[in-house]
Every structure is written in structure tokens, then in C-alpha cells.
């Protein structure tokens, strides 16, 4: 018997999302206009809370859908205007170009990145050194590339290796289902569990590595570019200004990586079983024998393009998104990718998040029009200049650990810049606050998958169920990093940032502040 029209519509609404989630969103959409009529300020804060809720529930439904519905309603009922949304989008065009073109550009360099991580995995036998290598490699790559792409590459390596061993363990060849362990011999299951633990720890080290590297440069994370633009910094300026906080944090993060592996704390320390290593080595040897001269040329070309990418970013030869577009053109032209559909695949990872970021800007427009953060900013600005840095860092960190850090960073840098333009703070203090906002947004956000887009991408990937990486396990494994990164970042903001910035200014490394 066919279902009713009403039931069919309910099932279509937000698809496979739970009924309670659908009902919650409907309640939000119904009550918002009435609360806005009664008290616009309260309605604005309620909208922000609802939007953060959709980000926190990203595993139930991709936030673009519910967040987009809330944003559309906000424009319709007058919480902001379509014109203001357009202004916010136009002001942040560089960030949208970064997401569209840079992520797609790196897609065409995946062969090189896969080659690098495969060599690391099979060449280094010490688990501690291997973990450190993955963390450092992810940090370095994320300083110049998009963290999402770096994690996507490491996921590709892990899924590939897991599939190779799973096929051998199940003896089912190409018909093997990686999610089905029923055909695996009992003596293989123990080895498989150990292999899963090994991959889990490597993925977490790589994920944290993207955060450690991503906070250091203006292209490491999308919000970095927003903050850099607000402060008028180029690539070198941004790196130097962040370094009093980010360099000590990087060192302590790498020491944490070594410590948890050595002590086998928080689910770390599992080594690669020799049986698995033998299988993977055989597969890699066969792959290398099959590699043609044409394939080798592709790797060389991608390496040269990588050098161009780093050089262009460091010298600020063009806007970041346009450099990404040049990578797409060079990589496709010189490696023979000419089919439109093959090129189109490069954009599938970035465009949903680009659309979500546009929705972010709609909510930011509401925050500006309704003056939602005015009380918080006034509270912070009443404190001494020294205390302001700590408060901005902590407020950013708290929100970023439960919500998306791009959203949080955008809000706070806009408010800080408005305070400077209104004469509430000096240019010198604003630039210090920009560092506190950037580090506060990036470092504590490793606490949960909600804060870091790369972590959320890992959690929702095809790899997570294979290696038994759940939300709770991810939070638990991230805990030592969360504690160390947050506390070291706070101490550096509190004690090192202002004197180090002053010293660099006097040494002529930074432009003299007016």
C-alpha cells in the first residue's frame, strides 16, 4: 500500500535525518518569526544557537540544508537583507576562491601526495618516528595546502592499504566487501584489529598535524585568510605575527605525539603487524614495476607545480584562489587530464563547503545587523589590554570546540575590527587581538570533530567505519592534543605574544605600527 502524501513529504524533508531532528528544525522555523517580532536581539541569538546546533549535528544532516533554511528565513523576516548578505559574500570572495580553486588544484596533485605518504608508511619501521613523520608531513602540507585535501589524501592511502590486506585476510579477491568480516579466518582477525588500531592512531596524528600546520599561515585554514585580510597582512607578515604562539605550540604538539606513542596512552601505540607489512610491501613492489615513464613524468611535474605553489604563496604573486586556479591549469595541461568530467570530480569535495560558507556569511550579516556580539565585545574591551588577549583566545576556543571555526573566527575578527574603527582599541592592540583570535579559533577546535572541518571529513569518510573510528573515540584520542595545544597556546598569548611582536617590530621584521 502506497504511503500518504503527507508521509511522503515528511520522508523527503531532510531525507534520512532522524524524525526528532526534522521536528526540531520545523519548530525553529515556526517560532523564529514570532520571537523576532517580540525581541529581535533574543531572536538573533536564538538563530545563532540554532545554527551552531546544525553544525554540532553535522552527522545527522549536512549543515548546508538546515542552516540554509534558517538563513533564508532570516532574510525573509527582516533579520538581515539580501543586499547585506551579498556585501558579506563579496567581502570574502578570496576565501570562496580559495575553497573552490585551491582544493580542486590539489586534487590534481594527489598522485604525488599518495606517493609521499606511501613511502613514509613502508620506509619507516619505528612507530614513534612514523607517527612523527605523518604529523610533520601533514603540518607542512597544511601550511600551504588545504587541510581537507591533506586529510583526504591520507584517507585514500589508509583505505587503499586496508583494502589490500582485507582482501588477503578474507580470501575473496575483487569480490571482497571491506565492511564484512564474516569471511575472515580467526587467526587473521587479531592481526586485523591491530592494523585498525595502527591506522586509527596514524589518522589522528595526521589530523592534528593539519591543525598544527594550518594555524601558521594565511592559507592553512579558510578563517586565516579572513583574519589576514581584515588585518591587511600578506603571507610572510601572517607567519611572523603568529610565530610567537604557533612555533612553541608546534614543538609541544610534536612532543605530545611522541609521548602518547611511547606510553601507549589514549589508544595510541599500536604498531604495524609484520604480516600486514609483508602484504603491503609486495603490493607496492608490484605497483612500482608497473609504473611507466609517463607515470614518473606525472610525479615530477606535480612536484615542480608544488614548488611553484609554495613560491607563489610566499611571494604573494597573486590572490590565493587564483594561484589555485593556476595549479589546476598547469596540473591538467601537463599530465593529460582533458576530459570535462574528470576535471569536474576535483570540485566535488570543495563546493558543498563553499556553499555552507556562504550560508555562514548570511548568519554573520544577521549578527552585524542585530548587534548580537556588542555586549560580549564591550565586556572584553572593558578589561585591560593584556587581559583582552586572553579573553578573546578563550571565548574563541570555547565556541570553536563545539562549532565550526570558520564561523567563529569570522564573527570575532569582524567585531574586533569594528572596535578598532570606532576608536575603542588601537591598531597595535587590534593586530595582537587578530593573533589571539586566529590561534584561539584553530588550536582548541581539535577537541571535537565539530570544530575542525578536516576532522569532520575524517569522521564522515568511508574509512571511519572500517577502522572503528567513532565520534567518542575521536574525542578521546584528541584529548591529549586538546589539553596541550590549548594550554600552550594560552600561555604564549598571555606571556610571549606582545613582547615577541614588539621585538620583531623593532628588529624591522614587521612594518612599524602607526
Curated annotation (Swiss-Prot):
Topological relation to the membrane, as annotated: Multi-pass membrane protein
Catalytic activity field: 2 Na(+)(in) + 3 H(+)(out) = 2 Na(+)(out) + 3 H(+)(in)
GO CC term (a single one): plasma membrane
Protein keywords: Antiport, Cell inner membrane, Cell membrane, Ion transport, Membrane, Sodium, Sodium transport, Transmembrane, Transmembrane helix, Transport
Subcellular location(s) per record: Cell inner membrane
Transmembrane spans: 23-43, 63-83, 97-117, 120-140, 144-164, 202-222, 238-258, 303-323, 357-377, 391-411, 447-467, 475-495
GO function term, MF aspect, one: sodium:proton antiporter activity
Source superkingdom: Bacteria
Any Pfam family matching the protein: NhaB
PANTHER family tied to this protein: NA(+)_H(+) ANTIPORTER NHAB, TRANSPORTER ARSB-RELATED
HAMAP family linked to this entry: NhaB
Family: Belongs to the NhaB Na(+)/H(+) (TC 2.A.34) antiporter family.
Protein name: Na(+)/H(+) antiporter NhaB
Organism in which the protein naturally occurs: Salmonella paratyphi A (strain AKU_12601)
